[in-house]
């Protein structure tokens, strides 16, 4: 028995030693963090003030663009350092070291797509000095915050660099046009997709949240008061790496913008400057091609191209994966590259992927040039860079110009092959090398109707029918989408049906709560209404409720809960390509859920649909694919907690004299992570009430509304007026 005890003790000691060895060896293999004193000293080169308005929104004011970028990095870190840190770790391929195995696929994709080979090779050659100075200043702001708050910093993060910002664009932008869906097709049915849902935006999951948005521009000719108006209304997750943060930047070098920012980026991604503005929505062109490779049966390290065997380019991806606590294991996986692009080996063979934007580090440059454009010509010059590989753009400016672009880095492809299918991988003439010029992209400028819109729908419905683009004018090789959304139909039925849009109507139409009779939802709803209820009392009652439903989603509506809980799962399954359940089964599930949790099958929609933040719980109207977009996550009590949809909303107006005003609202507030802050949820009541607040764009507008005025690292000084530069 004594020998058994000694043996067991020895085994424990060996295991403990192995764990200690893994922990120590992993830490030794990582570079030493920089001296915090050096990061703090770097801050001395910047002259900037952060002025928080009464909603906590930061206004960053400095003499140079670099000063403002530094202040933005610091201010955003004050409110959401955890997410900025997560973004940096993800784009470096280091997320699994903190998040565990669920993030290993993301880390592998960073290697597979050669994110850092691209950034390191092209950062200095392809990005001008003025931009690099801004990128590095933003990174200095993040580092300064981290140095002052070392307890919040994950080991290995520092220093954050300008290259991290660039890598974020290089890695993330292809997922906005559906690269993840193409990867999913190549994996097993049990595989996942890169999710855009909240804090898990970089993790593999098979239940991504819907991506949707609205953008509308109205010209003076269609406005009752001769104004030019722009709606900025992206539907995003409420939290996480692709959630919106509001700020105003004001540089003495002309970088003066207000709008929405993502964690880890110094640039306004959509919003306005003094002269012009734009809104983005996600589009769905075919920008990814998949090639089935012929692998040498005698040598798995080769593939055939034009009758010759070529060697795969091979490298090793070392992925550090958190196992438990501080224990990190280094996993290794082979990375293959062919002439077409990255290679994935699956049970069905080896496939190469070629996608728009690969190898391009210039998205940051395009965003910076868009931010500083002073007129339509400069803005279009920035768009001609074609470095942002997708997204719809709806534009408006102080001169009354409006426009719509179905933006994309469209490959120049041969006519004939089925580019939306799997292509033969042994023909080099199917490997495209260039993009369709910007001026050949689908776009509409200053149409006779005086309005343009997009709600993730086809570009062939973007204005009044007489001014719409024609499908026959574009090559099928562009892969332009032809689908419509409910929001697209409702835009046509509201903005498109009103020849003289007032300021009030422009606002009211944005908060439209109805499903169009032409929508997919209405078609599925018709299937549900056709269910034979027979003698089933529940089905008969449900049929009566649904028959009287007006297809609206007001908080007091007593048909919306039953209808949406029935039709939304059916639509989701069909969109996902899954075998949908029978409508009667979906209806029975909705009935059971509502009876169990609410004691009736016709509760008010606001009892079910909730906006929650900390201890706050508010009824909210709207729903899936509604212009007032709200996507909820089912809770154990049967309610839905809004997780995505309407978030940061902005209304921009230039009156007929060109004077700018704008209003905005955020679903929560500027304090992303601090529940003790008064700005953690102070905008939520306004948000659910469809109200907005003024954007204090100029120093004169901001004066008298300043809650805090400080240099980075010196917060606490209260001011009542604007600070000088």
Could you tell me what each predicted segment is?
Residues 2-527, 532-535, 541-725:
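C-terminal/peripheral segments of proteins
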